[in-house]
Amino acid sequence: MPLGADNPAGGPVRNKPIRLADGRMLAPNSDESAEAWLPRVDESTDGGRTFRRLAPIPLNRTDEAAPDFMPGVGAIQPTLWESAPGRVHALLRTQAGRVYRSDSEDGGRTWSTAYPTALPNNNSGIDLAVDGDALYLALNPTTGTWGPRTPLVVMKSTDNGETFADFATLADDPIDDRHGREGQFCYPAIVARGGRLHITYTHNRKSIAYAEIRLREGRE
């Protein structure tokens, strides 16, 4: 990805870009420092050859009385999807004990202030794939602001991410120092292709694991 001096779209991109109905590509991104994690979205209009900063995803880190208040340093590693032309959504990794969400009605040019969902998140990476009308989210459903990255599961939504239900467990092994079991299954990447989910993730920080889940019979 070429990035010139006038194109400061670089950053720790973890999750995949998406292509919108209008042909543009959006890449989830963030600016990270010890003081603040600030999520944003970058845009490509030339098929991914170049990207530019498009818009920040606003966070409420000051008004503790508001329902969208986000404790901690902020949010990173958004995962994106488009539910209808121009309607784009993001789920965010946080230190707040929950996955947060933000929505855009104008193709990612502006975003709502991120707000908490019912999905637990202990500051671990997440990723989402779309198959038809269903969303599949890979995450560690662990409460708290820090903790074991186990189990690693896939959850399914059929109402555009308003609610999620258990779908599959990819790995579940509690931490056990006596037997060298670390229980670290994290940083998932998930795509839906040909009626199947394809997922990779870190296995105890020593190797990369791959899982395939068949959604329908045959290949499409």
Predicted regions located by residue number:
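Asp-box/BNR beta-propeller blade signature and adjacent active/binding-site loops
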Residues: 1-220
